[in-house]
Amino acid sequence: MSDFMNRLREDHARLGRAVTAMRAHIQSPERTKRGGWLDLLASLVDYVAEYPDVVHHPREDRLFERLVDQGLTPAERQLVAMNLSEHAKLAEATERLMADVDAVLAGATLSETDLAAHALTYLDLQVEHMRREETQLFPLAERLLSEADFEALDKELDAQRDPLFEQRATRYDDLLEFIAA
């Protein structure tokens, strides 16, 4: 398997761990007693805005754009197009959730219960998006793209590292500790 595909799958595994931990925390009846959940959610959304939305999804877009020229069936073409447009929708959803988190932290009228429901919907979108890529799009790419395509994608793989799991940016220390717990 190519470095490019390995990287995409590794990114999914890492984000999946973060999403799973956050979902469990939000759904816990102890959420508000433990405190700090809003700060953790803010850190997670900030991370998604910084890395998956800005680095990971454009990498996937390059992969999927190569697929378009591979004689796809109409259903496969529709799946690729849907996924490409979904990346933009996920970025918008990230921005909306961050605005809601910021508003609650600033004392706005949005309740923590409503924010928790919004966050769970957002996390579900992320999970479903990654599931579709892992089960449908990545196998399609591996079946249709040539070794030369993957070599070209490997060369395009930029050096930008994951700020949460690789760079260990200090602003994400609490989030990383939370995920590891």
What are these regions (language model features)?
Residues 1-181:
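Small-residue-biased structural context
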